[in-house]
Amino acid sequence: MIRNIKVEHLHETPIEKQETELVERKGVGHPDSISDGLAEAVSRALCKEYIDKCGAILHHNTDETQIVAGRSRPEFGGGEVLKPIYTLLVGRATMEFDGMEIPAETVALQAAREYVRNTIPAMDLERDMIIDCKLGTGSSDLRDVFTRDHVPMANDTSFGVGHAPFSELEQVVYNTERQLLTDLKKKKIPGIGEDIKVMGLRENNDISLTICCGMVGRHIDDMDHYINAKEEMTEYVLDLATKYTDRTVSARINAADKVDGGCDCVFLTVTGTSAEMGDDGSVGRGNRSNGLITPSRPMSMEATSGKNPINHIGKIYNLLSTQMARDVVSAVDEVSDVHIKLLSQIGMPIDQPLVASAQVIPEDGANFAHIQSEAVVVIDDWLENITKITDMVVKGELDTF
């Protein structure tokens, strides 16, 4: 099959040589990320339910989850949620197939509660959060689109974008949030909340990190304990950064804190997320499908979480383009940066995009003809096996935010 694959030489300064770079990550406890996580958890649970009962994934989209912030009174040693967070699971799902009813809303609620329990352990689901579900009915007439007997047809004319490799700053920002939660919180500072936002700025060879972290009051005894925890976190972040860069790195945690003159104004929470006290959340307002917000790179603004993994281009092409970019960098020598853009055409097979564009910034002196031919092979192979993305999503092997 001949596909429209374009590999072009991009005459642009590689990201590592640009003077200024910005990168952001909203952690898993940020209200927008909670919305993303819930939407994807529900979609994944529905996929498994459909496969178990119907033998195939049926039509659904759960990418409209909304979080309405609650109200809380955090304090050292405890605190309480005064008004619970309200979460609404919204979308479409197939609830009947060949005369069999499918408990889609029950599955969605169970998946959402399990996700919150596993992601924000300080959240008391009996008191701190209300989870509601309003799924509309998807059409079972779409089942022909959702079979494994042929390549699905694109549900829309849309595009996906990915890039590789991660720059040093992108690695620092991504892993700062991940390691604070998966390592430092578990081993030493349980007071670290899941609502962590990391903003990274690189100016030439100087990197500055601004980190906001909602600390969990029940694990923080007093102001001295809070300040000491921040100091330990700062040291940890600076040490972690040396694994990814030799550049000079500085870090500030909870820069808005005011502790002088008797003003104890700090980022303290009851549950570990600012959703408890004023911050709402929506799907698609946070990280892109690679886990970052990268204004120095090409990006798609479309949400990935919660969309069906069969034929929804907003999900498949964003995830696929990132995998393609990473494999091009891994398999092809002398590539500094690569940007992948995939454009679908509604009603056409998803393995035949209107264009698969790879813009490559080669290393100095590279043989671009060789890069071009090798990149085409990588891209074409992924398109030939595009349904692998669906399998990876259902198995939980790909993150969407």
UniProtKB/Swiss-Prot annotation:
Keywords: ATP-binding, Magnesium, Nucleotide-binding, One-carbon metabolism, Transferase. The keyword Transferase applies. Its EC number is 2.5.1.6. One of its GO terms (biological process) is one-carbon metabolic process. The keyword Manganese does not apply. Pfam families: AdoMet_Synthase. It comes from the Archaea. Its cofactor is Mg(2+). Pathway: Amino-acid biosynthesis; S-adenosyl-L-methionine biosynthesis; S-adenosyl-L-methionine from L-methionine: step 1/1. It catalyses: L-methionine + ATP + H2O = S-adenosyl-L-methionine + phosphate + diphosphate. One of its GO terms (molecular function) is ATP binding. ATP binds at G136, T137, G138, S139, S140, D141. Residues 278-305 are annotated as: Disordered. Belongs to the AdoMet synthase 2 family. Catalyzes the formation of S-adenosylmethionine from methionine and ATP. This is S-adenosylmethionine synthase. The lineage of its organism: Archaea, Methanobacteriati, Methanobacteriota, Stenosarchaea group, Methanomicrobia.
